[in-house]
Protein backbone atom coordinates (compact mmCIF):
# COMPACT_ATOMS: atom_id res chain seq x y z
CA UNK A 1 0.00 0.00 0.00
CA UNK A 2 1.35 3.40 -1.00
CA UNK A 3 0.84 5.91 1.80
CA UNK A 4 1.01 8.98 -0.44
CA UNK A 5 1.24 10.21 -4.02
CA UNK A 6 3.01 13.37 -5.08
CA UNK A 7 1.29 16.14 -7.00
CA UNK A 8 3.88 15.58 -9.75
CA UNK A 9 2.60 12.01 -10.21
CA UNK A 10 -0.97 13.31 -10.41
CA UNK A 11 0.08 15.86 -13.04
CA UNK A 12 1.86 13.27 -15.16
CA UNK A 13 -0.86 10.61 -14.97
CA UNK A 14 -3.70 13.02 -15.79
CA UNK A 15 -1.80 15.31 -18.18
CA UNK A 16 -2.55 18.39 -16.14
CA UNK A 17 -1.14 21.83 -16.86
CA UNK A 18 0.78 23.55 -14.08
CA UNK A 19 -0.41 27.15 -13.74
CA UNK A 20 1.56 28.06 -10.62
CA UNK A 21 3.74 26.34 -8.04
CA UNK A 22 6.06 24.35 -10.29
CA UNK A 23 8.56 24.18 -7.44
CA UNK A 24 6.00 22.61 -5.09
CA UNK A 25 4.97 19.52 -7.05
CA UNK A 26 6.50 17.29 -4.38
CA UNK A 27 3.56 17.93 -2.04
CA UNK A 28 1.92 14.74 -0.78
CA UNK A 29 -1.61 13.52 -1.53
CA UNK A 30 -2.78 11.05 1.14
CA UNK A 31 -6.43 10.47 0.20
CA UNK A 32 -8.21 9.51 -3.01
CA UNK A 33 -11.19 11.74 -2.20
CA UNK A 34 -11.53 14.93 -4.24
CA UNK A 35 -13.23 18.03 -2.81
CA UNK A 36 -15.37 20.49 -4.73
CA UNK A 37 -15.56 23.52 -2.43
CA UNK A 38 -19.10 24.84 -2.39
CA UNK A 39 -20.11 25.87 1.11
CA UNK A 40 -16.54 26.97 1.71
CA UNK A 41 -17.01 29.75 -0.85
CA UNK A 42 -19.82 31.09 1.31
CA UNK A 43 -17.50 31.16 4.32
CA UNK A 44 -18.59 27.89 5.98
CA UNK A 45 -15.45 26.07 7.15
CA UNK A 46 -16.76 23.95 10.05
CA UNK A 47 -15.98 20.88 7.96
CA UNK A 48 -13.35 21.61 5.37
CA UNK A 49 -11.49 18.54 4.01
CA UNK A 50 -8.17 20.35 3.67
CA UNK A 51 -6.17 17.19 2.94
CA UNK A 52 -8.02 16.61 -0.34
CA UNK A 53 -7.20 17.93 -3.78
CA UNK A 54 -9.54 20.89 -4.33
CA UNK A 55 -11.35 20.89 -7.69
CA UNK A 56 -12.99 24.03 -9.06
CA UNK A 57 -15.23 24.01 -12.12
CA UNK A 58 -17.63 26.38 -13.84
CA UNK A 59 -20.02 26.47 -10.86
CA UNK A 60 -17.35 27.39 -8.33
CA UNK A 61 -15.54 29.95 -10.48
CA UNK A 62 -18.76 31.66 -11.57
CA UNK A 63 -19.86 31.95 -7.94
CA UNK A 64 -16.46 33.39 -7.04
CA UNK A 65 -16.87 36.12 -9.68
CA UNK A 66 -19.86 37.44 -7.75
CA UNK A 67 -17.85 37.94 -4.58
CA UNK A 68 -15.94 41.04 -3.62
CA UNK A 69 -12.15 40.98 -3.80
CA UNK A 70 -11.81 41.14 -0.02
CA UNK A 71 -14.37 38.36 0.62
CA UNK A 72 -12.88 36.04 -1.98
CA UNK A 73 -9.30 36.63 -0.85
CA UNK A 74 -10.30 35.84 2.73
CA UNK A 75 -12.02 32.60 1.65
CA UNK A 76 -9.14 31.50 -0.56
CA UNK A 77 -6.60 32.07 2.19
CA UNK A 78 -8.68 29.86 4.49
CA UNK A 79 -8.77 27.16 1.79
CA UNK A 80 -4.99 27.23 1.38
CA UNK A 81 -4.08 25.13 4.40
CA UNK A 82 -0.59 23.63 4.97
CA UNK A 83 -1.94 20.12 4.27
CA UNK A 84 -3.82 21.07 1.08
CA UNK A 85 -1.93 19.34 -1.77
CA UNK A 86 -3.17 21.24 -4.84
CA UNK A 87 -5.97 23.08 -6.61
CA UNK A 88 -7.26 21.89 -9.99
CA UNK A 89 -9.21 24.14 -12.37
CA UNK A 90 -11.27 22.32 -15.02
CA UNK A 91 -12.55 23.27 -18.48
CA UNK A 92 -9.54 25.50 -19.27
CA UNK A 93 -10.86 28.16 -16.92
CA UNK A 94 -8.59 30.85 -15.53
CA UNK A 95 -8.07 30.63 -11.77
CA UNK A 96 -9.36 33.60 -9.78
CA UNK A 97 -6.63 36.12 -9.01
CA UNK A 98 -7.39 35.75 -5.31
CA UNK A 99 -6.75 32.00 -5.52
CA UNK A 100 -3.48 32.54 -7.37
CA UNK A 101 -2.32 35.04 -4.75
CA UNK A 102 -3.33 32.83 -1.81
CA UNK A 103 -1.87 29.64 -3.32
CA UNK A 104 1.45 31.32 -4.08
CA UNK A 105 1.63 32.62 -0.52
CA UNK A 106 1.04 29.07 0.82
CA UNK A 107 3.23 27.32 -1.76
CA UNK A 108 0.34 25.26 -3.16
CA UNK A 109 0.31 24.39 -6.90
CA UNK A 110 -2.60 25.37 -9.12
CA UNK A 111 -3.22 22.89 -11.93
CA UNK A 112 -5.48 23.06 -14.96
CA UNK A 113 -7.08 20.86 -17.58
CA UNK A 114 -9.29 21.21 -20.65
CA UNK A 115 -11.48 18.32 -19.44
CA UNK A 116 -14.89 18.89 -17.89
CA UNK A 117 -15.20 18.83 -14.12
CA UNK A 118 -16.94 15.45 -13.99
CA UNK A 119 -14.40 13.85 -16.34
CA UNK A 120 -11.30 15.10 -14.53
CA UNK A 121 -12.90 14.19 -11.19
CA UNK A 122 -13.40 10.61 -12.38
CA UNK A 123 -9.90 10.36 -13.85
CA UNK A 124 -8.15 11.69 -10.76
CA UNK A 125 -10.23 9.55 -8.41
CA UNK A 126 -9.47 6.36 -10.35
CA UNK A 127 -5.77 7.20 -10.41
CA UNK A 128 -5.56 8.00 -6.71
CA UNK A 129 -7.65 4.99 -5.68
CA UNK A 130 -5.35 2.73 -7.67
CA UNK A 131 -2.22 4.26 -6.16
CA UNK A 132 -3.43 4.52 -2.56
CA UNK A 133 -5.42 1.28 -2.35
CA UNK A 134 -4.40 -1.50 0.00
CA UNK A 135 -2.45 -4.15 -1.91
CA UNK A 136 -1.99 -7.87 -1.50
CA UNK A 137 0.91 -9.77 -3.05
CA UNK A 138 -0.14 -13.11 -4.55
CA UNK A 139 2.11 -15.91 -5.82
CA UNK A 140 0.96 -16.48 -9.37
CA UNK A 141 0.93 -15.34 -12.99
CA UNK A 142 -1.46 -12.83 -14.56
CA UNK A 143 -2.28 -12.97 -18.28
CA UNK A 144 -4.78 -11.12 -20.47
CA UNK A 145 -6.52 -13.74 -22.65
CA UNK A 146 -9.00 -12.34 -25.18
CA UNK A 147 -9.68 -9.43 -22.82
CA UNK A 148 -10.23 -11.71 -19.81
CA UNK A 149 -7.79 -11.18 -16.95
CA UNK A 150 -6.74 -14.67 -15.84
CA UNK A 151 -4.63 -15.16 -12.73
CA UNK A 152 -2.91 -18.55 -12.73
CA UNK A 153 -2.07 -19.91 -9.28
CA UNK A 154 -0.60 -23.15 -7.98
CA UNK A 155 2.34 -24.62 -6.12
CA UNK A 156 5.87 -23.68 -7.13
CA UNK A 157 7.09 -25.78 -10.06
CA UNK A 158 3.64 -26.75 -11.32
CA UNK A 159 4.22 -24.95 -14.64
CA UNK A 160 2.65 -21.50 -14.28
CA UNK A 161 5.43 -19.55 -15.99
CA UNK A 162 5.85 -22.09 -18.79
CA UNK A 163 2.10 -21.93 -19.43
CA UNK A 164 2.25 -18.13 -19.49
CA UNK A 165 5.08 -18.27 -22.04
CA UNK A 166 3.00 -20.50 -24.32
CA UNK A 167 0.02 -18.14 -23.93
CA UNK A 168 2.18 -15.15 -24.88
CA UNK A 169 3.43 -17.07 -27.91
CA UNK A 170 -0.22 -17.66 -28.88
CA UNK A 171 -0.82 -13.90 -28.94
CA UNK A 172 -1.98 -13.12 -25.41
CA UNK A 173 -0.47 -10.54 -23.07
CA UNK A 174 1.56 -10.95 -19.90
CA UNK A 175 0.97 -8.68 -16.94
CA UNK A 176 2.91 -10.33 -14.12
CA UNK A 177 4.92 -13.45 -13.37
CA UNK A 178 5.74 -14.91 -9.95
CA UNK A 179 4.21 -12.05 -7.92
CA UNK A 180 0.93 -10.29 -8.67
CA UNK A 181 0.15 -7.07 -6.81
CA UNK A 182 -3.63 -7.17 -6.28
CA UNK A 183 -5.78 -4.22 -5.26
CA UNK A 184 -9.47 -3.34 -5.27
CA UNK A 185 -10.30 -0.46 -7.60
CA UNK A 186 -14.00 -0.22 -6.77
CA UNK A 187 -16.82 -2.31 -5.30
CA UNK A 188 -16.75 -4.90 -8.10
CA UNK A 189 -13.33 -4.56 -9.71
CA UNK A 190 -10.11 -6.29 -8.73
CA UNK A 191 -6.94 -5.21 -10.51
CA UNK A 192 -3.59 -6.97 -10.78
CA UNK A 193 -0.20 -5.53 -11.71
CA UNK A 194 3.45 -6.54 -11.60
CA UNK A 195 5.93 -5.18 -9.07
CA UNK A 196 8.10 -2.63 -10.88
CA UNK A 197 11.22 -4.79 -10.64
CA UNK A 198 9.45 -7.79 -12.26
CA UNK A 199 7.58 -5.90 -14.97
CA UNK A 200 7.58 -7.70 -18.37
CA UNK A 201 9.83 -10.50 -17.05
CA UNK A 202 9.29 -14.28 -17.05
CA UNK A 203 11.38 -16.83 -15.17
CA UNK A 204 11.67 -20.18 -16.95
CA UNK A 205 13.48 -23.01 -15.21
CA UNK A 206 16.46 -24.11 -17.27
CA UNK A 207 16.56 -20.85 -19.24
CA UNK A 208 16.46 -18.15 -16.60
CA UNK A 209 14.85 -14.73 -16.85
CA UNK A 210 13.51 -13.57 -20.22
CA UNK A 211 12.21 -10.13 -21.18
CA UNK A 212 8.85 -10.73 -22.84
CA UNK A 213 8.60 -7.21 -24.26
CA UNK A 214 12.05 -7.48 -25.83
CA UNK A 215 11.41 -10.93 -27.33
CA UNK A 216 7.77 -10.63 -28.40
CA UNK A 217 7.18 -6.88 -28.70
CA UNK A 218 5.12 -4.25 -26.89
CA UNK A 219 1.88 -5.98 -27.85
CA UNK A 220 2.78 -8.97 -25.66
CA UNK A 221 2.63 -7.10 -22.35
CA UNK A 222 0.33 -4.91 -20.28
CA UNK A 223 1.02 -2.91 -17.13
CA UNK A 224 -2.15 -4.06 -15.34
CA UNK A 225 -5.56 -5.62 -15.94
CA UNK A 226 -8.77 -6.51 -14.15
CA UNK A 227 -8.74 -9.97 -12.58
CA UNK A 228 -11.83 -11.75 -13.94
CA UNK A 229 -10.96 -15.42 -13.43
CA UNK A 230 -8.61 -17.47 -11.26
CA UNK A 231 -7.22 -20.73 -12.66
CA UNK A 232 -5.60 -22.93 -10.01
CA UNK A 233 -3.22 -25.62 -11.27
CA UNK A 234 -3.03 -28.83 -9.22
CA UNK A 235 -0.93 -31.92 -9.74
CA UNK A 236 -3.06 -34.81 -11.00
CA UNK A 237 -4.13 -37.26 -8.30
CA UNK A 238 -6.37 -40.21 -9.02
CA UNK A 239 -8.29 -39.79 -5.78
CA UNK A 240 -9.10 -36.14 -6.57
CA UNK A 241 -12.53 -35.67 -8.14
CA UNK A 242 -12.16 -32.69 -10.44
CA UNK A 243 -15.22 -31.01 -11.94
CA UNK A 244 -16.06 -32.55 -15.33
CA UNK A 245 -19.30 -30.74 -16.18
CA UNK A 246 -18.63 -27.25 -14.86
CA UNK A 247 -21.39 -27.40 -12.26
CA UNK A 248 -19.17 -26.56 -9.32
CA UNK A 249 -18.88 -22.84 -8.65
CA UNK A 250 -15.61 -22.14 -6.87
CA UNK A 251 -14.73 -18.61 -5.86
CA UNK A 252 -11.91 -16.78 -4.11
CA UNK A 253 -12.25 -13.52 -2.20
CA UNK A 254 -9.78 -10.64 -2.30
CA UNK A 255 -10.76 -7.69 -0.12
CA UNK A 256 -14.49 -7.18 -0.91
CA UNK A 257 -14.46 -8.77 -4.38
CA UNK A 258 -15.35 -12.41 -5.07
CA UNK A 259 -13.65 -13.84 -8.17
CA UNK A 260 -14.73 -17.04 -10.01
CA UNK A 261 -12.18 -19.85 -9.74
CA UNK A 262 -11.60 -23.14 -11.53
CA UNK A 263 -9.12 -25.91 -10.70
CA UNK A 264 -7.28 -27.66 -13.52
CA UNK A 265 -5.36 -30.92 -12.97
CA UNK A 266 -1.80 -30.96 -14.33
CA UNK A 267 -0.64 -34.17 -16.01
CA UNK A 268 2.03 -35.03 -18.56
CA UNK A 269 0.70 -34.52 -22.07
CA UNK A 270 -1.97 -31.97 -21.20
CA UNK A 271 -1.60 -28.67 -23.05
CA UNK A 272 -2.33 -26.25 -20.24
CA UNK A 273 -2.10 -23.15 -22.42
CA UNK A 274 -4.91 -24.33 -24.70
CA UNK A 275 -6.99 -25.50 -21.73
CA UNK A 276 -6.66 -22.13 -19.97
CA UNK A 277 -7.37 -20.34 -23.25
CA UNK A 278 -10.58 -22.39 -23.58
CA UNK A 279 -11.46 -21.63 -19.94
CA UNK A 280 -11.14 -17.89 -20.63
CA UNK A 281 -13.31 -18.12 -23.75
CA UNK A 282 -15.88 -20.20 -21.86
CA UNK A 283 -15.92 -17.61 -19.06
CA UNK A 284 -16.48 -14.87 -21.62
CA UNK A 285 -19.30 -16.84 -23.25
CA UNK A 286 -20.98 -17.27 -19.86
CA UNK A 287 -20.62 -13.56 -19.18
CA UNK A 288 -22.46 -12.95 -22.46
CA UNK A 289 -25.30 -15.30 -21.44
CA UNK A 290 -24.31 -18.63 -23.02
CA UNK A 291 -23.63 -21.51 -20.62
CA UNK A 292 -22.68 -24.77 -22.36
CA UNK A 293 -23.18 -26.75 -19.13
CA UNK A 294 -26.73 -25.45 -18.77
CA UNK A 295 -27.49 -26.16 -22.43
CA UNK A 296 -26.21 -29.73 -22.01
CA UNK A 297 -28.21 -30.16 -18.80
CA UNK A 298 -31.41 -28.86 -20.45
CA UNK A 299 -30.91 -31.15 -23.46
CA UNK A 300 -30.29 -34.13 -21.18
CA UNK A 301 -33.42 -33.46 -19.14
CA UNK A 302 -35.47 -33.08 -22.32
CA UNK A 303 -34.11 -36.39 -23.67
CA UNK A 304 -34.85 -38.19 -20.40
CA UNK A 305 -38.38 -36.79 -20.42
CA UNK A 306 -38.92 -37.88 -24.04
CA UNK A 307 -37.69 -41.41 -23.31
CA UNK A 308 -39.89 -41.58 -20.22
CA UNK A 309 -42.96 -40.60 -22.28
CA UNK A 310 -42.18 -43.29 -24.87
CA UNK A 311 -42.09 -45.97 -22.23
Curated annotation (Swiss-Prot):
It is an enzyme of class 2 (transferase). It catalyses: [HPr protein]-L-serine + ATP = [HPr protein]-O-phospho-L-serine + ADP + H(+); [HPr protein]-O-phospho-L-serine + phosphate + H(+) = [HPr protein]-L-serine + diphosphate. GO terms for biological process: regulation of carbohydrate metabolic process. ATP binds at residues 154-161. The keyword Magnesium applies. Residues 265-270 are annotated as: Important for the catalytic mechanism of dephosphorylation. It comes from the Bacteria. InterPro entries: HPr(Ser)_kin/Pase, Hpr_kin/Pase_C, Hpr_kin/Pase_Hpr_N, P-loop_NTPase, Ser_kin/Pase_Hpr-like_N_sf. Residues 202-211 are annotated as: Important for the catalytic mechanism of both phosphorylation and dephosphorylation. The Walker A ATP-binding motif also binds Pi and PPi. Both phosphorylation and phosphorolysis are carried out by the same active site and suggest a common mechanism for both reactions. HAMAP family: HPr_kinase. Belongs to the HPrK/P family. Catalyzes the ATP- as well as the pyrophosphate-dependent phosphorylation of a specific serine residue in HPr, a phosphocarrier protein of the phosphoenolpyruvate-dependent sugar phosphotransferase system (PTS). HprK/P also catalyzes the pyrophosphate-producing, inorganic phosphate-dependent dephosphorylation (phosphorolysis) of seryl-phosphorylated HPr (P-Ser-HPr). This is HPr kinase/phosphorylase. It comes from Levilactobacillus brevis (strain ATCC 367 / BCRC 12310 / CIP 105137 / JCM 1170 / LMG 11437 / NCIMB 947 / NCTC 947) (Lactobacillus brevis). The gene is hprK.
